[in-house]
Amino acid sequence: AMLAKRKDVTDKGWCDKLSTKLKTAKTQHSHELPNYWLAIGDSHTAAYSRMDSGVTKRDGMTLNGQCRSGFDYIKTILAEKEKRDREYDGYSSLEGITMSFGNIDIRHHICRLNTDFKPLLYQWRQFGESLGIDVEYSAPWPIEYEKRKPPKTGYYKGEPFWGSYNERSEIVSEWISEMKSLGMKLVMPPADWYNINPEKYAKEYMEANSSVHLSPAKYRRKDWGKSALGIFE
């Protein structure tokens, strides 16, 4: 199995069991699944998604870009889902969404442009409130070890990040504080993650290939690393 070749996968036997199980799996189409909740956003979206949530993402998306477009991407996805729901079920089944934005803004743009991010958060909340459904908002991840070498796909203008570890960590803290003051319903990892040694965080909580993403073993749907997958139980 290709999954067994990943450095962060230690149980190769589990991968073999998964391959065997997939051979007998029944194919289902998305409209057959009870997607009452949908996670939408950037490349970090899956990590913030709740159990049984549908996930749709577009890599490289920023909160700033969404604010400037009037959240066209989100509107398009929601309109497409409602159309499918009504076509197959006769009604819209969506109860709420989780939106994932902001990590890329903090990594590459806030310090580089020395810009005020608070208006972005206000616009984000205003848009969420306009939807008329339950809405969750992603809180930014802790800042990882500065010497970590992400792949070039994670660079912007030739740099892996803009701003020092301390500068970006301060922005993360202020960002979360502002979200709370705006009454936004946050999806965020345990508070102690933000006090972990950044090198330890990068090695034990992020993907082993030095990417900018969280390890799947630490996703929200895994209770931030406390739960096993349990696919063979």
Positions of PLM-derived features:
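Short, contiguous, pocket-lining structural segments
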Residues: 220
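Alpha-helical cap/lid subdomain in secreted, periplasmic
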Residues: 85-213, 225, 230-233
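Short, conserved phosphate/pyrophosphate- and ester-handling motifs at nucleotide-, phospho-/glycolipid
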Residues: 215-217
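Short amphipathic alpha-helical segments
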Residues: 18-23, 53, 78-90, 223-233
